């Protein structure tokens, strides 16, 4: 990625201050980002026992703002498909993440899969926020007004906040590079 690059030319450090091997700073940086991603994933709030499945949350939002057909389905067939796709992708990531976390407990270190999870997870977070805004129509992008609910106002703020998830913890472009080299074994 051509942005957010920092180069230290002719930098001098004492040997005892060196982290990792000499001239292997990127390897140390990648490992740090890997642990940061792992910590971010673990710090997310756990699902409550009585929490509605995401499908119900998306569907109820869509029905509230867009209406429903005679069979109780979301009126807009395209958005209905988008809701199902988002929910299936989120569920697939959740199941795969659970499996890999269980496997990594035996190895003691996060594997290269965390780069995939960060990239896919952040993309799904971003697309989920975008979908929620689309489902709310014009109410999905309000900033302040007494005519809108606190939930509608927070939805807009969440959508804006979630735009950053593909950047922090290592941009998606950095993740793609790591995946290409470490997971797929592609050459530089």
List PLM regions with ranges.
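Secondary-structure capping and boundary motifs in well-ordered enzyme cores
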Residues: 21, 75, 85-92, 109, ...
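Glycine-rich phosphate/cofactor-binding loops in nucleotide/flavin-utilizing enzymes
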Residues: 5, 23-45, 139-188
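Charged/polar, solvent-exposed surface patches and flexible loops
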Residues: 31, 60, 64, 102, ...
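C-terminal helix-coil-helix/basic helical segment that borders enzyme active sites and/or dimer interfaces
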Residues: 67-70, 74, 80, 91-147
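Short, charged/polar low-complexity linear motifs in solvent-exposed/disordered segments
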Residues: 45-47, 121, 131, 186
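Glycine-rich beta->alpha junctions and the first turn(s) of the following alpha-helix
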Residues: 1-92, 165, 181
